[in-house]
């Protein structure tokens, strides 16, 4: 996410490396490089200019204290301005009403229907809501089919009327259905187009007028940069939407949309989404995003994702096994599967400070774990529970069962043993426990 922008900003801050104090010359050079980085990231020139002017004004009036270098001070100023540019703080998401109504709008291909499913999953699993998805795209039967599949995957009902070509009546009937079935939030997936047109805008505006939604979310493909901002302006002028959703943040995103939309339409970014998995939806926090753009990672979100997936009782049992040096292949497989549930692996690693740059050109995907899973799944339950029982003969059988080379199995066994030895060493630390573990 934003790797190129991150590198360019880090390069700009190097202008201040070794400087004892901030002065007009090094500020000017740094600010010029920051402006270029923003423009190359597809941020509107006016926005980039105003942003860097504010950074310059703050830097000129700042004094460097002994504990902070000029470079660190500039990073702090830029981070604060990025946070402000993207909205300052988390935006409220209004789910009052019975039912509350959320209208989803955007161009075709923006990830609108997938987001509708993700939002329903988020509201059901994390907010305890009982959502109803509504297929109000009257032009594309495939959109109805897609929503039906998503609803089945997450256990959420989907309302549709395949023969009805009136989006307004579909939305109104869906709300009646929600009331009769005690659904407390209705998510209406409207039709998209390949480009903005009057008929599309009129239809969405009519649905809005008829159902009076609590929230109108404009879904935008973050990889489209300035085009996304221009589309947002057109939608906002007609719909006066309440918030923005940025999708496809796991792609080759330059950052222009994330950094420009709030300033341009004066509406907050409420959610960000990456990948096709239905649990890859996050509330948008400007400060956390600013940290990621500056290569500082996002430990807070990483911890929250882990807490949502890992069972506390299971964690206690695992802790005891690690203390007794009884960590086995089944434990390893269980942990691997929990980590995969947290989201895109490369995206998760990018939340670790400094890791985003290190893995930029490394091919990391969930597929990388498939070989390990195949090897463990080819073991008998006894072998999984007793790593020391795996003889050379058993390794041959496991390799054949997993469709792998013997060398692959040997390499994995070696890595697993190294991990067990590391755990053993940590258990021998003072106090006889691993750091952070309860005694």
Where are these regions (language model features)?
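Conserved phosphate-handling catalytic cores of large alpha/beta enzymes
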Residues: 171-175, 179, 183, 195, ...
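Short, glycine/polar-rich helix-capping loops at beta-to-alpha or helix-loop-helix junctions
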Residues: 141-147, 228-231
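Short acidic alpha-helix initiation/capping motifs at coil-to-helix transition points
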Residues: 6-8, 25-35, 280-281, 387-393
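Short, small-residue-enriched loops and turns at beta-alpha junctions
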Residues: 109-110, 139-141, 165-167, 192-196, ...
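Residue-level signature of catalytic and energy-coupling elements of molecular machines
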Residues: 16, 42-44, 78, 107, ...
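Long amphipathic alpha-helical segments used for membrane anchoring, targeting, substrate engagement
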Residues: 2-19, 288-439
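Primarily NTPase-proximal linker/entry elements flanking Walker-type ATP/GTP-binding cores
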Residues: 9-136, 143-164, 170-188
């Amino acid at each position: 996410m934003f790797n190129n922008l991150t590198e360019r900003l880090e390069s700009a801050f190097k202008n201040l490396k070794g400087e004892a104090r901030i002065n007009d010359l090094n500020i000017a050079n740094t600010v010029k490089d920051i402006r270029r980085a923003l423009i190359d990231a597809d941020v509107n020139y006016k926005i980039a200019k105003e942003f860097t002017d504010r950074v310059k004004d703050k830097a000129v009036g700042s004094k460097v204290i002994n504990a902070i270098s000029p470079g660190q001070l500039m990073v702090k100023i830029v981070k604060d301005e990025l946070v402000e540019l993207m909205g300052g703080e988390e935006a409220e998401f209004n789910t009052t009403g019975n039912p509350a109504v959320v209208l989803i709008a955007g161009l075709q291909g923006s990830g609108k229907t997938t987001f509708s499913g993700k939002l329903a999953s988020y509201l059901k699993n994390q907010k305890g809501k009982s959502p109803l998805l509504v297929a109000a795209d009257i032009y594309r039967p495939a959109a109805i089919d897609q929503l039906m599949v998503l609803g089945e995957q997450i256990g959420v009902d989907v309302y549709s009327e395949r023969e009805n070509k009136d989006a307004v009546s579909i939305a109104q009937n869906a709300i009646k259905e929600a009331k009769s079935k005690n659904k407390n939030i209705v998510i209406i997936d409207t039709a998209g187009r390949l480009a903005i047109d009057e008929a599309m805008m009129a239809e969405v505006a009519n649905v809005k007028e008829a159902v009076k939604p609590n929230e109108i979310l404009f879904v935008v493909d973050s990889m489209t940069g300035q085009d996304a901002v221009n589309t947002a302006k057109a939608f906002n002028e007609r719909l006066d939407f309440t918030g923005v959703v940025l999708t496809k943040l796991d792609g080759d995103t330059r950052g222009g949309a994330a950094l420009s939309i709030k300033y341009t339409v004066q509406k907050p970014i409420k959610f960000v989404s990456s990948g096709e998995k239905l649990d890859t939806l996050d509330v948008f926090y400007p400060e956390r995003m600013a940290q990621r753009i500056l290569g500082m990672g996002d430990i807070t979100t990483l911890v929250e994702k882990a807490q949502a997936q890992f069972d506390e009782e299971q964690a206690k049992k695992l802790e005891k096994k690690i203390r007794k040096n009884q960590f086995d292949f089944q434990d390893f497989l269980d942990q691997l599967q929990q980590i995969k549930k947290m989201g895109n692996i490369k995206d998760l690693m990018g939340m670790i400070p400094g890791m985003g740059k290190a893995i930029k050109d490394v091919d990391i995907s969930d597929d990388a774990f498939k070989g390990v899973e195949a090897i463990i799944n080819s073991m008998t339950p006894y072998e999984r529970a007793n790593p020391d029982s795996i003889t050379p003969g058993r390794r041959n059988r496991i390799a054949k069962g997993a469709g792998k080379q013997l060398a692959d199995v040997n390499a994995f066994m070696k890595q697993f043993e190294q991990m067990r030895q590391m755990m053993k060493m940590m258990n021998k630390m003072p106090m006889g426990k691993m750091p952070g573990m309860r005694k």
